[in-house]
């Protein structure tokens, strides 16, 4: 299946002109601002998850990871950036990549602080940033964050270890990571890939190690609320709890398959991350009728018929921060 996806991406990207990027930041741009509803004091900086990207393809023919979310924020007054990290690597390495781009945003905008938003494995990146540069962070929102790891990653790592297939898995997935880089108009070696490091970092066991060093916003109780404020930072989380949401969404099949494993061992989940694992700081809502990809409006915004629009939810969060002076 991964090979088919890789070949499809190769076919798509063969029509694009690959251009060198001097910055790995993608700033939200708009030709007109319709309101100041989402005009936060500090810029919003997004961190993608495992297998993530900024944009596959070009502006005119491509797909953003945060589909339609950043442009909407810009139209409503926000200064927002999407960062780029290695699709597959450890939480610490990705965290360093993220922090370097946060420093770039601070330099570009002259802002004193930043509002961070991380999805999936990106939750580790934003939490890493709170640990290494807390005075520069105003708020954190984790979205479907693997804050306690995922049983899916744990089981994949156990399978790799027991069958001795770890190196083969690493080679195949790293090759797919290179395809993702190419699809963004980048050299495949622009960011280092280490699928086994990524698997360990997102496993329950690996995340427990990470949490010993970066425990801000986490609860001592299973599935509990963390501190809402810590060191002057406002801490929030949201997540979905429905693996399959729309028959027209081709990703739902994968979410349903993964749910069979996650639900058996971890209960309610979004197809990859359990509701309990997604807990961080103040839970805004943990029952959005979304799956793991709906949370970022991926697959061109296809979602459940009556599900809230993720674009609106991110805009509302920006307004929440604005009202707090953040």
Question: Would you name each region that the model predicts?
Answer:
Residues 221-326:
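C-terminal catalytic-base region of ester-bond hydrolases, centering on the histidine
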Residues 36-114:
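Active-site catalytic motif of lipid deacylating hydrolases and related acyltransferases
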Residues 23-42:
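N-terminal low-complexity, Pro/Thr/Ser-rich intrinsically disordered segments
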Residues 48, 96-206, 270:
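Serine-dependent carboxylesterase/thioesterase catalytic core
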Residues 184-246:
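Serine-hydrolase catalytic core
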Residues 18-22:
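Boundary at the C-terminal end of the N-terminal hydrophobic targeting segment
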Residues 13-17:
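N-terminal signal peptide c-region/cleavage motif recognized by signal peptidases
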Residues 2-8:
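Sec-dependent signal peptide recognition
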């Amino acid at each position: 299946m991964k090979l088919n996806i890789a070949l499809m991406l190769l076919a798509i990207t063969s029509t694009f002109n690959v251009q060198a990027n001097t910055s790995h930041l993608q700033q939200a741009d708009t030709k007109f601002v319709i309101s100041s509803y989402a005009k936060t004091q500090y810029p919003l900086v997004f961190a993608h998850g495992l297998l993530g990207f900024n944009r596959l393809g070009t502006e005119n023919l491509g797909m953003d990871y945060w589909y339609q979310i950043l442009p909407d924020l810009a139209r409503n007054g926000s200064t927002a950036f999407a960062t780029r990290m290695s699709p597959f690597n450890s939480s610490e390495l990705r965290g360093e990549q993220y922090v370097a781009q946060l420093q770039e945003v601070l330099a570009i905008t002259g802002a004193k602080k930043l509002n961070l938003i991380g999805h999936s494995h990106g939750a580790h990146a934003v939490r890493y940033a709170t640990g290494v540069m807390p005075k520069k962070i105003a708020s954190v929102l984790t979205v479907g964050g693997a804050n306690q790891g995922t049983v899916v990653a744990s089981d994949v790592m156990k399978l790799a270890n027991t069958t001795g297939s770890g190196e083969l898995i690493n080679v195949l997935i790293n090759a797919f990571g290179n395809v993702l880089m190419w699809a963004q108009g980048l050299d495949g070696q622009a960011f280092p890939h280490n699928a086994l490091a990524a698997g360990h970092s997102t496993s329950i066991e690996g995340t427990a190690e990470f949490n010993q060093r970066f425990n801000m916003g986490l609860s001592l109780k299973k599935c509990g609320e963390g501190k809402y404020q810590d060191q002057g930072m406002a801490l929030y989380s949201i997540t979905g709890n429905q693996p399959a949401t729309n028959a027209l969404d081709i990703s739902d099949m994968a979410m349903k398959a993964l749910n069979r494993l996650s639900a058996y061992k971890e209960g309610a989940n979004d197809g990859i991350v359990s509701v309990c694992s997604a807990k961080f700081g103040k839970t805004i809502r943990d029952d959005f009728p979304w799956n793991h990809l709906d949370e970022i409006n991926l697959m061109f915004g296809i979602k459940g018929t009556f599900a809230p629009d993720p674009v609106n939810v991110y805009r509302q969060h920006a307004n929440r921060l604005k009202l707090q002076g953040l």
